[in-house]
């Protein structure tokens, strides 16, 4: 279901001069021994970004997942980009989260970087995030204008593809504008805020239990701390 979204995302990354980076050994691919599910992950070095990761889980009709997070270079203080798309076939349920994830919730920061996402939020009312996500505090590392829904097959094939394309374009536009203006947060603080994001996310990641059910706790714990949120690893 999400292959067209994956292709569009990777096409945009590659068009920006992305160079593949080696994924930690054993985490780039896994085949479930219990279920007919396969997970593949990619890591990219993209100009202007220190890290861009992508993960695709394919469990046939029962489950489909696409996840991606883009971490800007420390010299830029603009938001991270977060994508989470999940399809639960048995329940015919779509869960979609598309967000520019702010480093801080400061009013000036939000006014500086979120006009584009605000416009998308108004443009796609069925993805306007009015239903609060249960696993995360919307006032920390999530914006008030995220595109979020718990819908069905109709949204997965109608509004979501259009919203996804517009979301990616808007984020690229945000990045292109941000690199031309001085950051309001210094690089050392940006690095710490991105590290805090990893720690916060690793503690609350709702997909960890899902990965564990398919690939076991040992592999999934490694995947969480070594690939998804590597700055969460204790030193």
UniProtKB/Swiss-Prot annotation:
GO terms for biological process: phytochromobilin biosynthetic process. InterPro entries: DiHydbiliverdin_OxRdtase (IPR023658), Ferredoxin-dep_bilin_Rdtase (IPR009249). Gene3D superfamilies: 3.40.1500.20. It is an enzyme of class 1 (oxidoreductase). Pfam families: Fe_bilin_red. Its EC number is 1.3.7.2. It catalyses: 15,16-dihydrobiliverdin + oxidized 2[4Fe-4S]-[ferredoxin] = biliverdin IXalpha + reduced 2[4Fe-4S]-[ferredoxin] + 2 H(+). One of its GO terms (molecular function) is cobalt ion binding. Keywords: Oxidoreductase. Belongs to the HY2 family. PANTHER family: PHYTOCHROMOBILIN:FERREDOXIN OXIDOREDUCTASE, CHLOROPLASTIC (PTHR34557:SF1). HAMAP family: PebA. Catalyzes the two-electron reduction of biliverdin IX-alpha at the C15 methine bridge. This is 15,16-dihydrobiliverdin:ferredoxin oxidoreductase. It comes from Synechococcus sp. (strain CC9605). The lineage of its organism: Bacteria, Bacillati, Cyanobacteriota, Cyanophyceae, Synechococcales. The gene is pebA.
């Amino acid at each position: 279901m999400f292959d067209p979204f994956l292709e569009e995302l990777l096409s945009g990354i590659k068009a920006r001069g992305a160079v593949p980076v080696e994924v930690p050994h054993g985490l780039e691919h896994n085949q479930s021994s219990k279920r007919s599910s396969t997970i593949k992950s990619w890591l990219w070095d993209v100009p202007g970004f220190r890290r861009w990761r992508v993960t695709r889980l394919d469990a046939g009709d029962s489950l489909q997942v696409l996840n991606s997070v883009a971490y800007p270079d420390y010299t830029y203080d603009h938001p991270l980009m977060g994508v989470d798309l999940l399809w639960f076939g048995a329940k015919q349920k779509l869960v979609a989260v598309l967000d520019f994830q702010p480093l801080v919730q400061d009013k000036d920061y939000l006014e500086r970087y979120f006009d584009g996402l605000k416009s998308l939020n108004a443009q796609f009312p069925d993805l306007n995030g009015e239903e609060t996500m249960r696993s995360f505090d919307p006032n920390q590392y999530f914006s008030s204008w995220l595109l979020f829904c718990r819908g069905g097959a109709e949204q997965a094939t109608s509004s979501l593809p259009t919203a996804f394309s517009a979301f990616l374009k808007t984020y690229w536009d945000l990045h292109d504008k941000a690199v031309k203006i001085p950051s309001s947060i210094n690089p050392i603080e940006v690095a710490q805020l991105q590290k805090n994001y990893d720690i916060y996310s690793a503690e609350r990641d709702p997909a960890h239990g899902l990965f564990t059910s398919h690939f076991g706790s040992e592999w999934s714990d490694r995947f969480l701390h070594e690939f998804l949120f590597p700055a969460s690893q204790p030193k």
